[in-house]
Design a protein with these regions (language model features):
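A mid-sequence, solvent-exposed acidic-amphipathic segment
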Residues: 125-165
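Long amphipathic alpha-helical segments with strong coiled-coil/leucine-zipper propensity
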Residues: 45-126
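Charged, amphipathic alpha-helical oligomerization/scaffolding segments
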Residues: 11, 15-18, 22, 86, ...
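Beta-strand-enriched cores of mature, soluble protein domains
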Residues: 37-47, 146-151, 156, 181
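Structured alpha-helical bundle/scaffold domains in large eukaryotic membrane-trafficking regulators
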Residues: 28-35, 154, 187-194
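Leu/Val/Ala/Ile-rich N-terminal alpha-helices, chiefly Sec-type signal peptides and the beginnings
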Residues: 1-74
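Alpha-helical oligomerization segments
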Residues: 167-211
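Charged/polar positions within long, soluble alpha-helices
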Residues: 21, 25-28, 96, 100-103, ...
């Protein structure tokens, strides 16, 4: 089913929110749902979609994100999701700065293509530890060099775990992918308030479409 522009924006926002929610979850608890993680990381490799739904496995990859958008914008449940919102704002700011640095964007695109080729040759899933490690290094070498850097808060025992830090960086890359899509769809932060009703209605329609 073809989505309208507002519904596409709602889907991109869900992808962004879900990725940032998982960043917070890994940093605080060391855990992330495998299905939610897969939905986020797979989106990184969908660089030439026919439609927005393709980026998120026909929308099924961001079910959690759609629910989170309802909680945050619909119920104004800000306090419970404060860290997620903080990361969302940080990623949107980072994505804007990346767009102003074409060389980094080209390096990011080339790196994603190389990792995708490695995946295909070795038949690896997006959540394979080797793939996550490669995504983590790509983030460090590209987006991670842009100042000011996104600061992650969490439990030190989880942040000291190498695999957790790799998952966090890979998820930040997934968040950037959704932020790029949000910008391409002419998404603006002001729409969260001024266009909140339209976004929520679109979010609800998309949720029903993929259910």
């Amino acid at each position: 089913m073809k989505l309208n522009k507002t519904e596409e924006r709602a889907l991109a926002l869900a992808g962004l929110v879900q990725s940032c929610y998982l960043v917070a979850s890994v940093a605080r608890t060391g855990m992330a749902s495998q299905d939610n993680l897969t939905g986020c990381l797979e989106s990184i490799f969908v660089t030439n979609p026919n439609e927005t739904l393709d980026v998120y496995k026909d929308g099924h990859g961001v079910r959690k994100g759609l629910r989170l958008v309802t909680e945050i914008l619909g119920e104004l449940n800000i306090s419970e999701h404060r860290e997620t919102i903080h990361y969302v704002l940080g990623v949107l700011s980072l994505e804007r700065r990346l767009r102003q640095t074409p060389k980094l964007m080209r390096s990011l695109g080339a790196g994603i293509s190389a990792i995708q080729e490695h995946r295909h040759l070795n038949e690896l899933s997006a959540t394979d530890e080797d793939v996550i490690s490669r995504l983590s290094r790509l983030y460090e070498d590209t987006a991670g060099t842009v100042q000011p850097r996104i600061r992650i808060q969490g439990q030190q025992k989880h942040l000291a775990n190498t695999m957790n830090t790799s998952r966090i960086r890979a998820l930040l890359l997934a968040a950037i992918r959704s932020a790029v899509l949000w910008s391409q769809l002419e998404g603006r932060r002001s729409q969260w308030l001024l266009g909140r009703g339209k976004l929520l209605s679109a979010n609800s329609r998309v949720s029903k479409i993929i259910s």
